[in-house]
């Protein structure tokens, strides 16, 4: 790939990093974030939560195991990806591996990016870039080609509802007739979340983020992950409030789902300085010494001090003390800021799905006693 074009990553504070293009040759602007995971770039790139972001990978070697095929299971879910396309606006790496080797790979990362028209740049000192973002916070940035004029505006995400952009537009059903019915609010759901529910023998009814499901026939509510600012999702919050005011049906949330449930519980949300995007975030279950290693991808957090009196923290981040989950003190409503479905990452907390489905099948709803795996 000696014909790679020279590019410059320009941060909003003027800091510049020089590299070369190995993906689609087009300038792009977006929010520059970093992910410290050592693997999982196919899953991360197709995670709708990365919509609008220039994803920096701190692990130096990227692309050496190629890209798996875009095949689909009988239930319609992609076999190896988290959605049906790339959602990240670009990928930034230190050392792109042109040669790849993996039993399941069908193409290179470069070929995939070009086919989906997503820029990728290599030769960047990604650890130095990460230090800049760590000290100054995430910033907007642009990837510019050195031989072309800067003719794209800086990204401005104020007032942008990314959830509306990535959510489904109509109701989709999975595993029909399987048993208990779960309404899943699609804020940008990852495929493996749906798979984890299907594998536990429930029917999943996937609805758009702002769909009023309160009069539907279902047994439990699942609030999925998604990109951007949860304050843009007031319609979803109001529907959740309506649901919890009229029913004690079990509720579980993940990532954005944790934030939306918390907002419905009266809490406020704030933006983290540089977010949590990795496979090695330690969280502690409140009231215990149980610590779990989790996969995370979020830039906002719940201010637990603002939760209503009937709610309490369920998990806390061991690195910075931020909220990692909540639960109601009486009703079977709980959520996690981390991703128990992983994909990619550790599956230490997959018991969250077990507890949710177990609660669906219980005759009476009682205060949750979450199991441990230690």
Where are these regions (language model features)?
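Acidic, glycine-enriched active-site microenvironments
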Residues: 2-13, 17
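Feature captures the catalytic cores and cofactor-binding loops of soluble hydro-lyases/lyases
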Residues: 15-17, 21-146
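Flexible inter-domain linker/hinge segments
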Residues: 133, 138-181
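Phosphate-binding active sites in nucleotide-utilizing proteins
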Residues: 181, 187-238, 242-243
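Cysteine-nucleophile active-site neighborhood
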Residues: 218, 225-304, 345-355, 359-360
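Catalytic beta-strand/loop cores that center a nucleophilic Ser/Cys/Thr
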Residues: 290-331
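A glycine-centered loop/beta-turn motif at secondary-structure junctions
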Residues: 325-361
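Conserved small/polar residues in nucleotide/adenosyl-binding loops
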Residues: 366-372
